[in-house]
A protein has these predicted regions:
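Short linear sequence motif anchored by a di-proline
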Residues: 1-121
Length: 121
């Protein structure tokens, strides 16, 4: 996964917000990040057949882990159980990748919506 992604606030998520408003108070909803999303931001995910707000990343010894390899995820203690039992979908408009010259490139689709596979604690 990328190190940053983008959630465009112009995406029509009004129906999703109606669902979230029933679950969370306004102070919690205000934590939802839009625009450029960084690790540890609160973001919109779909898990357990419901929309939820979750912090991006795994906290481990004051570090925030955001990536793993599919080839080793089943063998890594911190991810093993969650890979089996806590899958989610991360909703985004696009994501950023950097080239070897540290230039940022924005990658998106024609309809400005991308779904990433994720796991959560």
């Amino acid at each position: 996964m990328c190190g940053r992604y983008y959630f465009d606030e112009s995406i029509d998520i009004s129906k999703i917000l109606q669902i979230l408003e029933k679950k969370y108070n306004q102070d919690t909803l205000d934590l939802l990040s839009t625009g450029e999303i960084f690790p540890s931001n609160i973001s919109l995910v779909f898990a357990n057949n419901d929309y939820q707000l979750m912090k991006w990343g795994y906290s481990l010894n004051k570090r925030n882990l955001i990536n793993t390899r599919i080839e080793t995820i089943r063998d890594t203690d911190i991810y093993r159980n969650d890979y089996q039992n806590h899958k989610c979908v991360i909703i985004a408009s696009g994501f950023y990748e950097w080239d070897r010259h540290k230039r940022r490139h924005y990658i998106t689709t024609s309809d400005n919506i991308i779904y990433f596979a994720g796991i959560y604690q």
